[in-house]
């Protein structure tokens, strides 16, 4: 289960931010 506003994909939670990021950068950002 993910927090409200977050989406789940393959067991991971993620959130779409206004700024675009590559997946690698997003992982480091988190």
UniProtKB/Swiss-Prot annotation:
Biotechnological and industrial applications of this entry: Used for quantification of normal prothrombin (CA-1 method).
Domain C-type lectin: 1-30
Tissue: Expressed by the venom gland.
GO cellular component: extracellular region
Keyword Amino-acid biosynthesis belongs to the record: no
Location within or outside the cell: Secreted
Disulfide pairings: 2-13
UniProt keyword list: Blood coagulation cascade activating toxin, Calcium, Cell adhesion impairing toxin, Disulfide bond, Hemostasis impairing toxin, Prothrombin activator, Secreted, Toxin
Function: Calcium-dependent prothrombin activator. This protein may activate prothrombin via recognition by the regulatory subunit of the calcium ion bound conformation of its gamma-carboxyglutamic acid (GLA) domain, and the subsequent conversion of prothrombin to active thrombin is catalyzed by the catalytic subunit.
Family according to the record: Belongs to the snaclec family.
Quaternary structure note: Heterodimer of a metalloproteinase subunit and a regulatory subunit comprising two polypeptides disulfide-linked (14 kDa and 17 kDa chains).
The protein's name: Snaclec carinactivase-1 regulatory subunit 17 kDa chain
């Amino acid at each position: 289960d993910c927090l409200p506003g977050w989406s789940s994909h393959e067991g991971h939670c993620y959130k779409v931010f206004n700024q675009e990021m590559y997946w690698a950068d997003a992982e480091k950002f988190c």
